[in-house]
Amino acid sequence: MKFIGAHVSAAGGVENTIARAQAIGANAFALFTKNQRQWQAAPLSEASIHAFKLACEKGGFRPEQILPHDSYLINLGHPDPDGLAKSRDAFLDEMKRCEQLGLCYLNFHPGSHLKQIPEAASLKLVSESINWALERSQGVTAVIENTAGQGTNLGWSFEHLATIIDGVEDKSRVGICFDTCHAFAAGYDLRTADACAAVFAEFEQTVGFQYLKGMHINGAKCTFGSRVDRHHSLREGNLGEAVFHHIMNDDRFDGIPLILETIDESIWGDEIRWLRSLAKA
């Protein structure tokens, strides 16, 4: 079964995300468990935790249908020791919040070398940061998102992702979230059926589908290989529709959250219905 949804607002409390997902016909969703642009956040209240779990149970949302995202400030490959420590502490707090909510994934961008250390050294720090957080948490898988490769961001190539995973000691608690827009921007062509088949074959060979824990389903305002991160609605922009047909008809993408981060939330319901219509009977 395909679990399709969107990154919905947690305004007013994380317990409100379930109703927002249901309102667009989703059977998956993503959320921030705290303000994504601040380092510090108030702890989750017991009332909010209970209400979230109850709403998930009533709505039929299991943990594997939910893909929380961490703060954009966190850089697990930070070249500065103080910046790295601050990022690790914040990441662990995010892991603990997922634990409290009974969730099993935490999606994150791997980090940036900031032109201060070699790429390989920063990738090693990301792996070490994941190990550090996994040792101090339970039950939550660290889900690395492929990036567009903008600026000094790591994680734009499948080789980067494989290198990070290789350095993680507990392979059962690390995974990948594949973003269609980011892959396209990073130079992975997804504009035809044959191109999609080739890219996903390369992903299988380099990373492995056993690590795929979620996807971000996005169109692209950016051009191919531009290394610029600009999302678009599914049926607009430069990516085209072939990749969405492929995903909806490939059972390797069953049973994981497929999350819209497209730019017009007023049509998320329409985009979810359109995706479902692509599945061949």
UniProtKB/Swiss-Prot annotation:
EC number(s) on file: 3.1.21.2
Cofactor(s) required, per the database record: Zn(2+)
SMART domains (alphabetical): AP2Ec
Catalytic activities: Endonucleolytic cleavage to 5'-phosphooligonucleotide end-products
InterPro entries according to UniProt: AP_endonuc_2, AP_endonuc_F2_Zn_BS, Xyl_isomerase-like_sf, Xyl_isomerase-like_TIM-brl
Residues annotated as binding Zn(2+) 2: 145, 179, 216, 261
Residues noted as binding Zn(2+) 1 in the record, renumbered to the chain: 69, 109, 145
GO MF term list: deoxyribonuclease IV (phage-T4-induced) activity; DNA binding; DNA-(apurinic or apyrimidinic site) endonuclease activity; phosphoric diester hydrolase activity; zinc ion binding
Keywords annotated in UniProt: DNA damage, DNA repair, Endonuclease, Hydrolase, Metal-binding, Nuclease, Zinc
Cofactor, free-text remark: Binds 3 Zn(2+) ions.
Chain sites annotated for binding Zn(2+) 3: 182, 229, 231
One of the GO biological process terms: base-excision repair
EC category: hydrolase
Family: Belongs to the AP endonuclease 2 family.
Protein's job: Endonuclease IV plays a role in DNA repair. It cleaves phosphodiester bonds at apurinic or apyrimidinic (AP) sites, generating a 3'-hydroxyl group and a 5'-terminal sugar phosphate.
PANTHER family: APURINIC-APYRIMIDINIC ENDONUCLEASE, ENDONUCLEASE IV ENDODEOXYRIBONUCLEASE IV
Record protein name field: Probable endonuclease 4
Organism: Aeromonas hydrophila subsp. hydrophila (strain ATCC 7966 / DSM 30187 / BCRC 13018 / CCUG 14551 / JCM 1027 / KCTC 2358 / NCIMB 9240 / NCTC 8049)
Gene expressing this chain: nfo
